[in-house]
């Protein structure tokens, strides 16, 4: 890649003028769906097709989404066409690759390693509890005898980024289209609309970077494309994706208690099983409980298991009072104007 602003501009112009592949990432979330609709309705994708470009849609499967998201992606595929499923591949001994994926990127297999029989059996049991034929995140947790945390959030890199980078490596002169908005976080606000990514070996384009959430909702409404149904249930912080994320808010946790309690029960089982493997007490959430000595002096603050985090999510007054009658939050359908449908 030629250095400097001029070099980037020159390479960008070349990338756009020479036919290649446009990779549009779809997650089942509102922003990536809005990105596809925007590019389709603006005529960008059709123009690229006419110029000889290939448009590729892809979903990086963490194996940690809720069933509603997987069902929504199948529905979305009827509108956009083929969605390539990519994932990190962590095999058990003698285990055949799972069906339903277009690309599996080796993780442990790169070193010729496989999960031993007992750990592979544990992974399959947890996958069955999730209702998934294969879960990259579960496989990596079992393989490494650890869970991701806010301090060591390896989940994004190992279950989303690496498979997508593997897919990009198979494409020709790709432009990687990502549906993120500046309003989501300070980190995303600092990202440019266009950039060259050494990690991706491709240009990255964020077409709706300056959009508001209201614009995203309005595009869905105007296009007649329903959002992921999880948004209409409220979905805690208003975002869908890994459930739960290690960065889950109190609202996210409370929503899971109310709507997806089984997922929290399974996460509790995962904490317990991983604890048996590593001899410690791994905790998914960063919530801590103060431990005091007999004199009432603070001794330590220890992470709590998911069951206690779920109890805390239903409290008020800083966790001091159980909220038997928590104030009702406006349902997600209010923001989407779809409560009467």
Residue ranges and their predicted role:
Residues 148, 235-238, 326, 332:
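Residue-level signal for mature regions of secreted extracellular proteins and peptides
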Residues 155-156, 209-212, 228-232, 254-257:
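Generic, ordered loop/turn and secondary-structure boundary motif
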């Amino acid at each position: 890649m030629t250095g400097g602003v001029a070099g980037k501009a020159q390479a960008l112009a070349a990338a756009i003028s020479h036919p290649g592949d446009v990779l549009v990432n779809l997650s089942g979330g509102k922003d990536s769906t809005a990105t596809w609709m925007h590019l389709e309705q603006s005529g960008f994708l059709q123009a690229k097709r006419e110029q000889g470009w290939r448009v590729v849609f892809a979903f990086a499967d963490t194996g940690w989404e809720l069933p509603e998201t997987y069902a929504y992606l199948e529905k979305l595929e009827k509108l956009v066409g083929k969605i390539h499923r990519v994932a990190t591949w962590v095999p058990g001994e003698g285990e055949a690759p799972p069906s339903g994926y277009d690309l599996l990127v080796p993780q442990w297999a790169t070193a010729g390693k496989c999960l031993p029989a007992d750990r592979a059996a544990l992974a399959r049991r947890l996958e069955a509890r999730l209702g998934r034929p294969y879960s990259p995140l579960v496989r990596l947790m079992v393989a490494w005898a650890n869970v991701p945390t806010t301090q060591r959030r390896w989940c994004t890199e190992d279950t989303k980024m690496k498979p997508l980078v593997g897919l990009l490596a198979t494409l020709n002169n790709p432009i990687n289209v990502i549906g993120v908005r500046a309003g989501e976080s300070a980190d995303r606000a600092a990202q440019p609309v266009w950039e060259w990514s050494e990690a991706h070996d491709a240009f990255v384009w964020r077409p709706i970077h300056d959009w508001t959430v209201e614009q995203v909702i309005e595009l869905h409404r105007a296009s007649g494309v329903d959002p992921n149904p999880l948004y209409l249930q409220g979905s805690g912080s208003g975002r869908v994706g890994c459930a739960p994320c290690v960065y889950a808010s109190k609202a996210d946790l409370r929503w899971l208690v109310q709507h997806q309690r089984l997922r929290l029960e399974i996460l509790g089982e995962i904490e317990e099983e991983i604890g048996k493997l590593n001899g410690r007490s791994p905790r998914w959430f960063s919530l801590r409980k103060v431990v005091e000595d007999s004199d009432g002096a603070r001794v330590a603050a220890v992470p709590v298991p998911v069951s206690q985090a779920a109890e805390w999510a239903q409290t008020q007054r800083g966790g001091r009072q159980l909220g038997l009658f928590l104030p009702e939050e406006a349902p997600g359908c209010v923001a989407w104007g779809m409560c009467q449908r």
